Amino acid sequence: MLETITSVNGVVNGIVWGPVGLALLFGTGFVMSVRTGFFQFGHFRYWLRNTIGAIFTDRDITAHTEKNDKAISQFQSLCTALAATIGTGNIVGVATAILSGGPGAIFWMWAMAILGMMTNYSENVLGIFYRRKNADGEWSGGAMYYLADGLGSKKGCKKLGRVLAVLFACFCVLASFGIGNMSQINSIAGNMNAAFQVPNLLTGILLAVLSALVILGGLKRVAAVTEKVVPLMALFYILGALTVVLTHVTAIPAAFAAIFKGAFAMQAAGGGVLGYGVSRAITWGFKRGAFSNEAGLGSSVMVHSSSNVKEPVQQGMWGIFEVFADTIVVCTLTALVILTSGFVDLNTGRMLTEVQGSALVGEAFSTVFGSFGPKFIAVSILLFAYSTVLGWSHYGTKAFEYLFGTKASMGYKVVFVAMVLVGATMKLDLAWDLSDTFNGLMMLPNLIGVLSLSGTVAAITRNYLDRKFHGKRVEPMWSAFAAYQKEEEAEEAPLDKAANE
C-alpha cells in the first residue's frame, strides 16, 4: 500500500513540480507583471515606503483593532504571513538548492521571487476584493473565494470555479498537516536533539502545549504572537548571518560571480553527489524559490484577507514585501553564508563537503561561531518552524471552514495541535513527499484563478493609481460585493469629510 502511495505521489509530484508546473508558476508571475506595468519595479519606492517604511510613521499600519473587531492590523497580517513563509525552506531549502543545482540556483531563485512578487500581489488584491464575512463576523478570503465568486462569475465557469475552489481547500487542509505542521515539528525535534540532546517526545509535548495555547485562541491570538516573534526571529537570524558573511567579506565578490556563472554556464558535477548545469540550476532555483516564499500557492492570502485594510492594492503591496523579505533578504543571506564559508569551490561550483541540509548551514556558521554554530541554526529552525506552524494553522482553519462551516473549525484546530506530537516522534519521509505534492496541487487551481482574473487585478490597480497618482475622482474598487463596498464607503465618508474641513 505504502509503495503504491509513494509511486503515485512520485508521478503527481513530477507533474506539478516538473517543467509544466514551474513554467506555469513563472509564466503567471510574468503575465501579472506585464498586466500591472511591472508595478514591483516602477513603484518600488512607493510600495517600500507604504509597507515596511510606514511601520514607524503610520499608526494605521500597526494599530490593533477593537476587541470586538475580528480583523487584524496590516502589520499583524504581514507577520502572520511571514511566520508561515519564513520556515525551514529559508535554511534547509537554500542549502538543498545549492547542493542540487549549484550556486546558479540562487540566481533563478531571485528570478522566481521577482516575478513571484506580482503573483503574491495579485493573490492579495483578489483576496481583499472577493473576501466576505463568516458567521462569526471574521473576514474570510483566499483562493477558494476568488475561484468560486470570481472565476465562477464568468460565463460558463460557475461549476468550474466551485470545483476548483473545493479542490484548493482540500489540498490546503492536507498540506497544512504536512508542510505546515508535522514536517516543521520533525525538523525542530531532530535539530534540538542533535544540538542540545533534547528528547523528541519532550520537544513534541512542549510544542503541542505552546501551539494549543496560541492556536485555540483564534486568529487574533495567533497574530498577537507572530507580530512579536517574527521581527525578533528575523533580526536574530539576519544579524547572525551578516556576521558570518562580513567575516568572510573578501569572498563575497567570488560568491556572486559563482551565482551568475552557474546560472548561465554548464559546470562540472557537484561534490560527486548530483550533476548539474543550467537546467538543474533553473529547476532547483524555481522549485526552492516557490517553496520559500509560497508565491503562487495561494496560502498567505488567507491571512492577508483578514487585514483591516480597505484598499486591495495596499494589501497587495504587503504581498510584494513579503516575497522580498523572504527570498531577496533571508534566502540570499543563507546562500552567502554557505558560499563564503569555504564549503563550495567558487570557481567550479563543486561542493567540498558531504554535509547536507541544515547541518551544512550549521557548519558554515561554525566557521565564525565555533561549536555554537549548529546550536544557532537549531534555535533558528525552532523559531522559524514553530512560527510556520502558527501561520499554517490559520490557512488550514480557513480552508476547513470553507468546506464544513465555521462551527467545524474548532475540531480542525484540535486535530492540528495533536499532529504536533505526531510530527515530533515519527519518521516522516513520506509525509514530506506528500506535503510537497499537496503544495503543488494547491498551486494549480490558484494560478488558474489568478490568470483568469488578471483583468480584474489590472483594473483594480489602474483604479488605485488613477486616484492616488493622477488625481482622478473615480469610485474606488474595494469589494466585488455591493454590500461590502457600501460598508467600506460609509466608514470612509467621515474621514473624507474631516480631511476637507
Region locations from a protein language model:
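Alpha-helical membrane segments and immediately flanking helix-loop junctions
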Residues: 59-98, 129, 135-151, 173, ...
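Membrane-interface alpha-helices at helix entry/exit sites of multi-pass transporters
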Residues: 62, 67-71, 102-111, 149, ...
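Transmembrane helix-loop junctions in multi-pass membrane proteins
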Residues: 4-5, 35-40, 89-94, 176-189, ...
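Helix-loop-helix module between adjacent transmembrane segments
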Residues: 32-33, 112-137, 148-186, 190-214, ...
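Membrane-interface loop-to-helix entry segments
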Residues: 24-48, 164, 168, 185-192, ...
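N-terminal alpha-helical transmembrane segments of multi-pass membrane transport
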Residues: 1-84, 88, 98-105, 116, ...
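Extracellular/periplasmic helix-exit of transmembrane alpha-helices
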Residues: 123-135, 242-258, 266, 270-273, ...
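Flexible loop linkers connecting adjacent transmembrane helices
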Residues: 38-72, 96-98, 102-106, 110, ...
